[in-house]
């Protein structure tokens, strides 16, 4: 079967797993576009994206443009004479001029069942809103965000325990399957395109670190979803004696304590820290103190009891 010459655009781990599948396929990844290197951590060290690391290890030429409209970059991209561009969680809007460079167009692997959850946080949004299913959509890209015709989609169930990390791993598996299938259909010219229903569009919102502070005025159910959706980033937290305490795992206790204040610690034992919310109780099971490892609450019942005194309002 004919192989395609592919330019791949992506940045994160989710992207890198799809790139790895293309590298090991019959197709030819001739170049990669990824985000510029960033400074991170206390030492502000330069960090490479997972896609850049994988590309370096496989000797694939890399572009890291600050500006995708840069003429010099666009000319170099055009000279590659690639058949198709594949975009997976790249993080920047691709200009129309680039979209029009490739004879087979540009395709995007998106982690939702479009048109639900267009935008940058589809996985987190599906968990936050209690969706029972999500999936992968492969779309033909146009100059509007996530609005192109659907070329293929696969559904994936969401469990009540899924975090963004665990759900991402499920979606990577089916995303790779969908991507390779679509590339084969492109070669055979058998893709069936389906327009998105604009009436069903729901946009996902950008997530910021400040959004991770737990608000006890929300229900326990919403807080538990938030904790799963914000794992592994930015990780939900609450304040106790001026300490930022991160929450990695929780559960809902379906009891409402109307005689207790919102945010009040009503129990602290080997099963967790039980905190009253606007509706029902949130039981925190795993947490992390500043600069420390993630631990089960049962392991700090005695040593941290002053932080979690019953009756304390957080």
From Swiss-Prot:
| Protein keywords | Protein biosynthesis, Transferase
A Pfam family annotated for this chain is: Formyl_trans_C
What would be one Gene Ontology cellular-component term for the protein? cytosol
Q: InterPro entries, alphabetically?
A: Fmt, Formyl_trans_C, Formyl_trans_C_sf, Formyl_transf_N, Formyl_transf_N_sf, Formyl_transferase-like_C_sf, Met-tRNA-FMT_C, Met-tRNA-FMT_N
Q: What is its EC number?
A: 2.1.2.9
**EC main group:** transferase
Q: Where does (6S)-5,6,7,8-tetrahydrofolate bind?
A: 112-115
Any one GO MF annotation of this record = methionyl-tRNA formyltransferase activity
Q: Which family does it belong to?
A: Belongs to the Fmt family.
Instruction: Give the protein's biological function.
Output: Attaches a formyl group to the free amino group of methionyl-tRNA(fMet). The formyl group appears to play a dual role in the initiator identity of N-formylmethionyl-tRNA by promoting its recognition by IF2 and preventing the misappropriation of this tRNA by the elongation apparatus.
Q: Which NCBIfam families match?
A: fmt
The protein's name in its UniProt record: Methionyl-tRNA formyltransferase
Q: What gene, per UniProt, encodes this protein?
A: fmt
């Amino acid at each position: 079967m004919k192989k395609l010459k592919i330019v791949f655009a992506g940045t994160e781990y989710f992207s890198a797993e799809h790139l790895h599948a293309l590298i090991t396929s019959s197709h030819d990844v001739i170049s990669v576009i990824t985000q510029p290197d960033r400074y991170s951590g206390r030492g502000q060290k330069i960090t490479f994206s997972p896609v850049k690391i994988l590309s370096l290890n496989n000797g694939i030429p890399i572009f890291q443009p600050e500006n995708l409209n840069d003429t010099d970059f666009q000319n170099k991209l055009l000279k590659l004479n690639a058949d198709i561009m594949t975009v997976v969680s790249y993080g920047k809007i691709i200009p129309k001029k680039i979209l029009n460079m490739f004879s087979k167009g540009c395709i995007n692997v998106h982690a939702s069942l479009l048109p639900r959850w267009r935008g940058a946080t589809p996985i987190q949004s599906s968990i936050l809103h209690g969706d029972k299913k999500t999936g992968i959509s492969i779309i033909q890209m146009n100059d509007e965000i996530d609005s192109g015709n659907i070329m293929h989609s696969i559904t994936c169930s969401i469990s009540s325990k899924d975090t963004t990390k665990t759900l991402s791993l499920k979606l990577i598996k089916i995303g790779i399957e969908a991507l390779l299938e679509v590339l084969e259909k492109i070669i055979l010219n058998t893709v069936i395109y389906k327009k998105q229903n604009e009436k069903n569009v729901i946009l996902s919102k950008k997530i910021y670190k400040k959004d991770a502070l737990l608000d006890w005025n929300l229900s326990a159910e919403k807080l538990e979803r938030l904790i799963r959706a914000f794992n592994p980033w930015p990780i939900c937290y609450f304040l106790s004696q001026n300490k930022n305490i991160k929450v990695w795992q929780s559960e809902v206790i379906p009891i409402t304590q109307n005689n207790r204040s919102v945010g009040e610690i009503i129990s602290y034992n080997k099963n967790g820290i039980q905190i009253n919310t606007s509706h029902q109780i949130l039981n925190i099971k795993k947490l992390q103190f500043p600069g420390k490892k993630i631990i089960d609450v049962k392991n700090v019942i005695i040593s941290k009891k002053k932080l979690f005194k019953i009756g304390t309002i957080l």
